Amino acid sequence: MASQGSVTAALRVAEVLESIANRCVGPEGGQVLCTKPTGEVLLSRDGGCLLEALHLEHPLARMIVACVSSHLKKTGDGAKTFIIFLCHLLRGLHAIGEKGKDSFTSENIQSHERHWKNCCQWKSISQALQTFQTQTLGCIVDRSLSRHYLSVFSSSTEGRKLCRHSLELLLEAYFCGRVGRNNHRFISQLMCDYVFKCMACESGVEVFELLDHCFAELNVGVTGLPVSDSRIIDGLVLPRDFSMYCPADGDIRMVIVTEILQPQFSSAGSEFVLNSETQFQASQCWITDRTKTVMNHLRGQNVKLLLTSVKQPDLVIYCARLNSISVVECLSAEEVSLVQRITGLSPCVLPEVASQCEISDSTLVKFCKPLILRSKRYVHLGLISTCAFIPHSMVLCGPVLGLVEQHERAFHGAFKMLRQLFTDLDLNYIIQTKQQCNPSPLAYDNSRERNHSPETDKYQDIVAKSKNKLETQTHLEVYSGLGASDTELRAGKPWSAHKKTPIAPSQTDEMLKCLPPERSGIIDNCDLSIENHSTGNPTAEDTGTEISFEHLQVSDNAGKGYTLPVMRKSLDTCTCQGYCSSTVPAGCVLPVGGSFEILMSYYLLSYAKQCRQSDETVISMLIADALLGIPKILYKPKKGKDSFPHIYMRSLHALQASQPMVSGQSGFESVAGKYQLLTSVLQCLMKILTIDLIINIKRQPQKTADQESEDEF
């Protein structure tokens, strides 16, 4: 059975998923009760958990949920918003398709021909979406949205410092949509305390990478207790009991082994021949003596704790008790890796342990004791950290296992979100301008002699060589201020006049200072003259300025912002194209409650109004309208001044008057996470638009290994 892949089919599937997401989105959302295919009942507000619990048969639905899961693995946030935003984009495309439907209704066109024409149309839109995402979207974020950034870091004379209040607002907004109303404040406060206890420095990137990667080993779930009993424990908690526990005082040294300490009769690939019982008993005595010697040597090195990834023979445990050495067996590879990352300790090899030389691979621990949580015994280790992470374990309690698992999932997602927040997000885009070029020879000013430096000489030689060989002219665009006005967001707009304006070096330096560090290194093909370009309106003032090399200060800010020059032949109308790279700095946030969506919609519409290319205009308006669907749902329960129309109009008035926006909700959300969500949804939409045909294949479910083994018997 085959069906045509179309926007209409995808919209029907997405609307079913949207009906689930709408019920639990936002602070006013409720919990959704569903039954898993296994018969287990799930009550949750976590969008990712609900989507993964669905038994989906439609291939488009499975593909959409797979895209959501892939996004959550990176960011840990945005599952419900993903579905809502995608659904609004599909509605917009469906409306576009309905408008152009008349061109395909001729009687002499067969149905399959109309289908392939539609496929070609959607594929062209998919290509336009990809071009817009890779070449334009980052520019709008970098030049317009950046002026509204807030930060979770507080500036002080000592440098960047994480603000606890900002982190609390960020985490409270995050957990508000994932756990019940009765617990989200307690959970967010617990998470905030955990972050500050684990961080040895303010950077946090290394800490959150470790917390994300080793979350299962740093978390302990306990059922049968209220959520309020959840707490933070200093040190590392291993979910197993001691094979041998010997209380120890004073300095406690620890070693890790990954092999059996008791010598074997023979090694792998060889055989040991015994001709008599006497030889066997003699061999047994030698093995016993050798094992005792190894354990005595460990005691002589003040080793009082032995961690092993394999199960040791009873003789090793017996000798450990004689030497007052505690033993913890059967550590997983992940647990061994975590201990190694925290302590910097490498596993001991058997020859080193068996010899009488000093054991180098050992470390001190603060304490080593058993821990009992709800009748279960655990190993509690006080590890001394050699990295930025101070070891602490999280004990999450709940009356039932399902609630504990939901809180564990929410915590893990929060660590992913914070990991991305504390990392700079790269933005890559292209600047394109069209203007009238003067093919006359390039003029040099004598002031170049006064601003002489090796860097400027290097770039002057490049431009001179370009002039002699390719007869090219190049341009350097510098934008004053952190954000761009509406006139700066034009694509390919020709300037009607050029006005020569002398600019002093001090003024040029001031303009360069206005650029953020990540954009101060923009080096385009530059015209060696200073020109102000009018916008055609004699009363309007353009902020785009071309700067000559005699006033150019080359930035050493490598890795933050740069533009690769693209040479164009000198014509009456030349196009300058700069490949720019910038970043969303670590710690950037916006007020929660649709601020990101309203701001991006506003700047996308401003860009669409000044766009000369029709496809970019359509894409900009499509994304802008779809983004507004998210705050509409968030403010749907609100009435009066708190309703969406009032919030939206106040936001527009504030933007037009260059005043700060006022959010209707308290809390913050990560800018990097929201931008990643936007790009992930666009990539999912591109996949949907490239589907021509959906073929359903009915087959028997594959047998598992257990079923096959039973059939064999």
UniProtKB/Swiss-Prot annotation:
Keywords: ATP-binding, Cell projection, Chaperone, Nucleotide-binding. Its main location: other. One of its GO terms (cellular component) is cilium. Coiled coil: none annotated. The keyword ATP-binding applies. It is found in: Cell projection, Cilium. GO terms for molecular function: ATP binding; RNA polymerase II-specific DNA-binding transcription factor binding. GO terms for biological process: chaperone-mediated protein complex assembly; cone retinal bipolar cell differentiation; negative regulation of neuron apoptotic process; neuronal action potential; non-motile cilium assembly; photoreceptor cell differentiation; photoreceptor cell maintenance; protein localization. Probable molecular chaperone that assists the folding of proteins upon ATP hydrolysis. Plays a role in the assembly of BBSome, a complex involved in ciliogenesis regulating transports vesicles to the cilia. Involved in adipogenic differentiation. Component of a complex composed at least of MKKS, BBS10, BBS12, TCP1, CCT2, CCT3, CCT4, CCT5 and CCT8. Belongs to the TCP-1 chaperonin family. This is BBSome complex assembly protein BBS10. The lineage of its organism: Eukaryota, Metazoa, Chordata, Craniata, Vertebrata.
